[in-house]
Swiss-Prot record:
Any further remark recorded for this protein: The active site is a conserved redox-active cysteine residue, the peroxidatic cysteine (C(P)), which makes the nucleophilic attack on the peroxide substrate. The peroxide oxidizes the C(P)-SH to cysteine sulfenic acid (C(P)-SOH), which then reacts with another cysteine residue, the resolving cysteine (C(R)), to form a disulfide bridge. The disulfide is subsequently reduced by an appropriate electron donor to complete the catalytic cycle. In this typical 2-Cys peroxiredoxin, C(R) is provided by the other dimeric subunit to form an intersubunit disulfide.
Pfam families noted in UniProt: 1-cysPrx_C, AhpC-TSA
Taxonomic lineage: Eukaryota, Metazoa, Ecdysozoa, Nematoda, Chromadorea
Native species: Brugia malayi (Filarial nematode worm)
Any one GO MF annotation of this record: thioredoxin peroxidase activity
InterPro entries: AhpC/TSA, Peroxiredoxin, Peroxiredoxin_AhpC-typ, Peroxiredoxin_C, Thioredoxin-like_sf, Thioredoxin_domain
Enzyme Commission code: 1.11.1.24
Protein's name in the database: Peroxiredoxin 2
GO biological process, one term: hydrogen peroxide catabolic process
Superkingdom per UniProt: Eukaryota
Length: 199
């Protein structure tokens, strides 16, 4: 895998885009800019009508209420057409389809979005399993890219967002395996000792 041509960097503005998506069984124009002011989870996946992909997209879609409670928008994106997306949404889940979706499914057949985010598998023209967390100011806070056979975790994505939001609000930092309610660290040489003395 190569990140050549990627414009996605931690701490920098996420590459903007505008494209057609399947939303509530219809076609709609979606842009990243319209979500300014809230966190965004952007999921790239390889192909419609495959095997791991529906398990991931359905998992995120079915738990959208938890993301909405945190004021987070979730979107999935592949290099398939919006017509392919719609056919997949209209396919029963027992037949490998998506069924009713609570998140937009973005289409971008010319590869511009997946290339900008550094997830395009150039030899096949499909996207690796990239997951990007973008903050309310449009800044990238988290990037993970999986190879094709391994899916991603909704629980870990929610945990990361909760950690970023805690830092935004309180200015303290979150140690390994932090969950809401766990101890955090005051970022300073002297201040951090209070945490380290307990652990």
């Amino acid at each position: 895998m190569t990140l050549a041509g990627s414009k996605a960097f931690i701490g920098q503005p996420a590459p903007n885009f505008k494209t057609t998506a399947v939303v509530n069984g219809d076609f709609k124009e979606i842009s990243l800019g319209q979500f300014k002011g809230k966190y965004v989870v952007l999921l790239f996946y390889p192909l419609d009508f495959t095997f791991v992909c529906p398990t991931e997209i359905i998992a995120f879609s079915d738990r959208i209420a938890e993301f909405k409670q945190l004021d987070v928008a979730v979107m999935a994106c592949s290099t398939d057409s919006h017509f392919s997306h719609l056919a997949w949404v209209n396919t029963d889940r027992k037949m490998g389809g998506l069924g009713q979706m609570n998140i937009p499914i973005l289409a971008y057949t010319n590869h511009v979005i997946s290339r900008a985010y550094g997830v395009l598998k150039e030899d096949d023209g499909i996207a690796y399993r990239g997951l990007f967390i973008i903050d309310p100011k449009g800044i990238l806070g988290q990037i993970t890219i999986n190879d094709l056979p391994v899916g991603r975790s909704v629980d870990e994505t929610l945990r990361l967002i909760q950690a970023f939001q805690f830092v935004d609000k309180h200015g303290e930092v979150c140690p390994a395996n932090w969950h809401p309610g766990s101890e955090t660290i005051k970022p300073g040489v002297k201040e951090s000792k209070a945490y380290f003395e307990k652990h």
